[in-house]
Every structure is written in structure tokens, then in C-alpha cells.
């Protein structure tokens, strides 16, 4: 990714077409479940919950700048950041028919069975 910045690098909050995980929401949920490493410390303390992570989905679909907006536990937060950082490229958001950078929130649900 280049260091050049111009007006086209603006990060949008609201766009005509939101970014999306390849193959949709169910595929995203399945991917998260398959790739999640539930922290042992959280298992031992029976900690569950939903971590809300905000990311930027770049024009090329890459996920950058993950930030926890709603925390459950430091170890779960760390795993949520690891998960979203390792996701495959998304379908980028669009505004006026062009790919744009978009802030997007992802909920990671940690549930013990």
C-alpha cells in the first residue's frame, strides 16, 4: 500500500453499497467459527460475549486498522483483533459506482458450548 494520500483516500461512514464478506454473512460466521482460537484464560473463567470491532475496508477489500469498540475481556478482544486482521479480502464498499474506503463494524461472538 502506497504512502500517497489524496481526496480519494477518504474513509466513508455511509456508502451506497456496504463492504461485504465474500459469499455473504453466513460464510463470514462460518469463517469466524472455523478460525477462532478461544483463549484458554477466558475458557477457564467461563467468559463469553460479543466483541465489536471497527475496521477500515480498503478499496482492494483488505481489512486494516482494527479497533475494539465494545470490549468483553482483554484476551477475547485480542483474539477478535487477530481474527478480523486475518480475514480474507472483502468485497469493497462503493460510492457513486467506485470502490471506496469504508469504516465497518464486525461483531465477534464468543460462546462456550
Sequence positions of predicted segments:
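Charge-biased low-complexity segments
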Residues: 1-113
Amino acid at each position: 500500500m502506497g504512502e500517497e494520500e489524496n481526496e480519494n483516500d477518504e474513509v466513508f461512514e455511509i456508502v451506497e453499497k456496504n463492504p461485504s464478506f465474500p459469499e455473504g454473512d453466513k460464510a463470514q460466521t462460518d469463517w469466524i467459527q472455523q478460525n477462532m482460537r478461544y483463549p484458554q484464560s477466558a475458557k477457564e473463567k467461563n467468559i463469553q460475549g460479543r466483541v465489536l470491532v471497527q475496521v477500515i475496508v480498503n478499496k482492494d477489500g483488505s481489512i486494516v486498522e482494527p479497533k475494539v469498540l465494545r470490549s468483553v475481556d482483554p484476551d477475547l478482544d485480542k483474539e477478535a483483533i487477530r481474527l478480523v486482521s486475518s480475514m480474507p479480502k472483502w468485497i469493497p464498499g462503493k460510492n457513486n459506482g467506485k470502490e471506496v474506503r469504508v469504516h465497518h463494524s464486525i461483531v465477534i461472538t464468543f460462546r462456550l458450548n
